[in-house]
C-alpha cells in the first residue's frame, strides 16, 4: 500500500480513467466511503470503474455537491460506469470491530463485489483495506480522482437513502435530516428517548445516552 498526498483541486471531468487504452492490462477502480462519523446507521462504501468512452461531467467530492446534484450524478454513474458496487458494514459490525476496521471491511466488500476485477484500487484517504489487488491510498482523492469522486457520490447517496428509510422506522431522531450525525437535535432526542437499534453503542454520545436510562 502506498499513500499519495497532492494539492487539493477539483476532479477533472476528462481523462477519467478506469480503462487505460494505452495499457490494456490496467483496470483502475476508485473507492470511497460514507458514514464514518455518524452515531447511527451503517458505514457504506462504493467502488467504481469508469468507462472513458462514456465520460461524466461534474464529478467531485460528494461533500461539496448539493443533494440534487448528487442524485443526478448517481444516476449517471450507475448508467455509464463500466462496473460499480456499493457495500456496507452494519451497526453490529461497527460496534464489534470498531469504525476503522468496519470501514475497511465495507471497502473490501465493494471492491470484491465488482463484476470486473480491477488491477488497481485507488482509495480515498491514507489507509487501504487488505485486498487481492494492488491498492493505493490518495489523500483528498475524492476531489482529485474522478473514479473516487464517483465512488464518494454512490456511497453518500446510498447511505442518505438508508437513513431516510431508518427515519420511517424511528422518526423521533430525525435521521432524514442529519443522516445520523451528532447534531443538537439528534443528541437531544438521544437523551430524551435513548438509543434505538440503529445507534452505534461503541460511540461515546450513544453510551452516555444509555447511561441516562439505566
Curated annotation (Swiss-Prot):
Location of the region described as Disordered in the Swiss-Prot/TrEMBL record: 1-21
Q: Superkingdom of the source?
A: Bacteria
Q: Where does a divalent metal cation bind?
A: 32-33, 124
GO CC, one annotated term: ribonuclease H2 complex
Please give the catalytic activity noted in the UniProt record.
Answer: Endonucleolytic cleavage to 5'-phosphomonoester
The note on the cofactor says: Manganese or magnesium. Binds 1 divalent metal ion per monomer in the absence of substrate. May bind a second metal ion after substrate binding.
What is a biological process (GO) this protein takes part in?
A: mismatch repair
Q: Which Gene Ontology molecular-function terms are recorded?
A: manganese ion binding; RNA binding; RNA-DNA hybrid ribonuclease activity
- What positions does the domain RNase H type-2 occupy? 26-214
Instruction: Write out the biased-composition intervals (Basic residues).
Output: 1-10
Q: Which cofactor does it need?
A: Mn(2+); Mg(2+)
Q: What's its EC?
A: 3.1.26.4
| Keywords attached to this entry | Cytoplasm, Endonuclease, Hydrolase, Manganese, Metal-binding, Nuclease
Matching entries from HAMAP family are given as: RNase_HII_B (MF_00052_B)
Tell me its family. Belongs to the RNase HII family.
Q: What does this protein do?
A: Endonuclease that specifically degrades the RNA of RNA-DNA hybrids.
What's the name of the protein? Ribonuclease HII
Amino acid at each position: 500500500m502506498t499513500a499519495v498526498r497532492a494539492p487539493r483541486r477539483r476532479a477533472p471531468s476528462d481523462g477519467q480513467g478506469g480503462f487505460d487504452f494505452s495499457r490494456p492490462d490496467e483496470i483502475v477502480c476508485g473507492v470511497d466511503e460514507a458514514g464514518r462519523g455518524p452515531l447511527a446507521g451503517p458505514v457504506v462504501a462504493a467502488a467504481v470503474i469508469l468507462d472513458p468512452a462514456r465520460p461524466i461531467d461534474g464529478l467531485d467530492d460528494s461533500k461539496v455537491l448539493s443533494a440534487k446534484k448528487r442524485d443526478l450524478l448517481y444516476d449517471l454513474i450507475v448508467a455509464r460506469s463500466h462496473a460499480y458496487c456499493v457495500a456496507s458494514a452494519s451497526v453490529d459490525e461497527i460496534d464489534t470491530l470498531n469504525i476503522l476496521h468496519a470501514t475497511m471491511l465495507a471497502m473490501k466488500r465493494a471492491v470484491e463485489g465488482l463484476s470486473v476485477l480491477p488491477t488497481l484500487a485507488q482509495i480515498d484517504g491514507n489507509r487501504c483495506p487488505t485486498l487481492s489487488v494492488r491498492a493505493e491510498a490518495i489523500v483528498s482523492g475524492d476531489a482529485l480522482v474522478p473514479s473516487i469522486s464517483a465512488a464518494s457520490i454512490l456511497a453518500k447517496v446510498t447511505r442518505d437513502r438508508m437513513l431516510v428509510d431508518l427515519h420511517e422506522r424511528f422518526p423521533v431522531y430525525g435521521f432524514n435530516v442529519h443522516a445520523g450525525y451528532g447534531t443538537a437535535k439528534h443528541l437531544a432526542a438521544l437523551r430524551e428517548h435513548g438509543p434505538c437499534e440503529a445507534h452505534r453503542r461503541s460511540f461515546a454520545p450513544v453510551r452516555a445516552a444509555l447511561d441516562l436510562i439505566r
